Amino acid sequence: MRIAKVRGTVVSTYKEPSLQGVKFLVVQFLDEAGQALQEYEVAADMVGAGVDEWVLISRGSQARHVRDCQERPVDAAVIAIIDTVNVENRSVYDKREHS
């Protein structure tokens, strides 16, 4: 799993039928200090995340184990909206401070 920040949405009128009703987000991965990396991915949103929220991403075959992703061609899924991140006893992110 990786930490990312939601940067935007992807809208698709025509898609694989099993993806009907799935919301897609553009996410940018973050390093251990919370700094943005130049690495982006489109992920299926399973939790109702919004732009600028920090999220947890499940990727690869593990993404297909997420409920509602089974039997769907999904390589990345947003599986959690992050409240706090602490690294080495230091707060990197607190959602309450970014609301």
UniProtKB/Swiss-Prot annotation:
Chain segments annotated as coiled-coil in the UniProt record: none
Induction details: Carboxysome size and components vary with growth conditions. When grown in ambient air at medium light (50 uE meter(-2) second(-1)) there are 7.4 units of this protein per carboxysome, the numbers are stable under low light, and increase under high light and high CO(2) (at protein level).
Residues spanning the signal sequence: none
Usage in biotechnology: Heterologous expression of 12 carboxysomal genes in E.coli (ccaA, ccmK2, ccmK3, ccmK4, ccmL, ccmM, ccmN, ccmO, ccmP, rbcL, rbcS, rbcX) leads to the formation of bodies that resemble carboxysomes, have densely packed paracrystalline arrays and RuBisCO activity. These structures open the door to generating carboxysomes in plant cells to increase their photosynthesis and productivity, as well as tailoring bacterial microcompartments to specific metabolic needs and molecule delivery.
Keywords of the record: Bacterial microcompartment, Carbon dioxide fixation, Carboxysome, Photosynthesis
GO-annotated molecular function: structural constituent of carboxysome shell
GO cellular component, one term: carboxysome
GO biological process, one term: carbon fixation
Disruption phenotype: An insertion in this gene leads to rod-shaped carboxysomes and an inability to grow in normal air, called a high-CO(2) requiring phenotype, HCR. When ccmL-ccmM-ccmN-ccmO are deleted no carboxysomes form, cells are HCR and RuBisCO is soluble. Both mutants grow on 2% CO(2).
InterPro entries found in the cross-reference section: CcmL (IPR046387), EutN_CcmL (IPR004992), EutN_CcmL_sf (IPR036677)
Record localization: Carboxysome
Entry-linked CDD domains: EutN_CcmL
Disulfide-bonded cysteines: none
Function: Probably forms vertices in the carboxysome, a polyhedral inclusion where RuBisCO (ribulose bisphosphate carboxylase, rbcL-rbcS) is sequestered. Has been modeled to induce curvature upon insertion into an otherwise flat hexagonal molecular layer of CcmK subunits.
Domain notes: The tight homopentamer forms a pore with an opening of about 5 Angstroms in diameter which opens into a wider tunnel at the base of the truncated pyramid. The pore is positively charged.
Sequence similarity: Belongs to the CcmL/EutN family. CcmL subfamily.
Protein name: Carboxysome shell vertex protein CcmL
Organism: Synechococcus elongatus (strain ATCC 33912 / PCC 7942 / FACHB-805)
Gene: ccmL
